[in-house]
Swiss-Prot record:
Organism listed in the record: Stutzerimonas stutzeri (strain A1501) (Pseudomonas stutzeri)
Enzyme Commission numbers on file: 3.6.1.41
Disulfide bonds: none
One Gene Ontology term of the molecular function aspect: bis(5'-nucleosyl)-tetraphosphatase (symmetrical) activity
Gene encoding the protein: apaH
Family note: Belongs to the Ap4A hydrolase family.
Upper classification of the organism: Bacteria, Pseudomonadati, Pseudomonadota, Gammaproteobacteria, Pseudomonadales
Name of the protein in question: Bis(5'-nucleosyl)-tetraphosphatase, symmetrical
Length: 275
């Protein structure tokens, strides 16, 4: 058995199938980790979502911001944006099954044997892995509880609060947890977020740094897999931290990592398909 991890699909299924064929991936034998943002902007959001769902226990995915956006759109909380490519999912005969499957997924996955965690955007530097898993569980409960789902989705959007306070409660608390795990790039050592800056690691606003580069980061002893930040181009210059979103949907590449050997496989892409 081999375990692989891949960055954001964003509705680009063909590059993934190309990579899986290259490594002779077998669902009966191997496992695929996906770092979130399965859907949106690419040409095959519906097909990508079905593909991952149908892998069943051979796939482990965490939720990204685009996946959460799909949940909000599907529940009539948020409108579609011009760049969204979600309509095929909303019109699909298995829409209800797909949406229900998506809301059961986690924000963080941790493999104790590998001492490896996967998250879409990152883990704020002031939180230990144990604390991050507890915070993620709060949002996961809101997503999976019918009574909590709509209030959470309705209050999910927004950049405030930007700094963690243990006294936060209700939707603002869940919004900040969600922003940490699905939208974060730059923050201060105390976890104060800047969600406006979206370029490479060297474009940090004054007083901020990439979340993974803070010397005080409490997850330095954990191997971390993340996606989301395509502008890093797979480079983060931190031991044990692996940026796997290499911008397939933007015409760059999709990257598949062998978690056992560390080997990286790339599929160059154009218009969401193998170049």
């Amino acid at each position: 058995m081999t375990t692989y991890a891949v960055g954001d699909l964003q509705g680009c299924l063909e590059p993934l199938t190309c990579l899986l064929e290259r490594v002779d991936f077998s669902p009966s034998r191997d496992c695929l980790w996906l770092a979130g943002d399965l859907v949106n902007r690419g040409p095959q959001s519906l097909e990508a979502l079905r593909f991952v769902r149908d892998l069943e226990s051979s796939a482990i995915t965490v939720l990204g911001n685009h996946d959460l956006h799909l949940l909000a759109v599907a529940h009539n909380i948020e409108r579609m944006r011009k760049s969204d490519t979600l309509q095929a999912i909303l019109d699909a005969p298995d829409r209800a099954d797909l949406i229900d499957w998506l809301r059961q997924q986690k924000l963080i996955h941790y493999d104790a044997e590998r001492h490896t965690a996967m998250v879409h955007a990152g883990i704020p530097p002031q939180w230990s892995l144990e604390k991050a898993l507890r915070r993620a569980a709060e949002v996961e409960q809101a997503l999976q509880d019918d009574a909590l789902l709509l209030p959470f989705l309705d209050g999910m959007y927004g950049n405030q609060p930007a700094k963690w306070n243990k006294e936060l409660h209700g939707v603002p608390r869940l919004r900040l947890i969600t922003n940490y795990f699905t939208r974060m790039r730059f923050c201060k050592a105390d976890g104060t977020l800047d969600l406006d800056a979206k370029e490479g690691a060297d474009s940090a606003p004054a007083g901020y740094a990439p979340w993974f580069s803070h010397a005080s980061r409490k997850t330095r002893n954990v191997k971390l897999i993340f996606g989301h930040w395509a502008a890093l181009e797979g480079q983060c210059d931190e031991p044990n931290v692996f940026a796997l979103d290499t911008g397939c949907v933007w015409g760059n590449a999709m990257t598949l990592m062998n978690l056992d050997s560390g080997e990286m496989h790339r599929c160059e892409c154009e218009h969401g398909k193998p170049a």
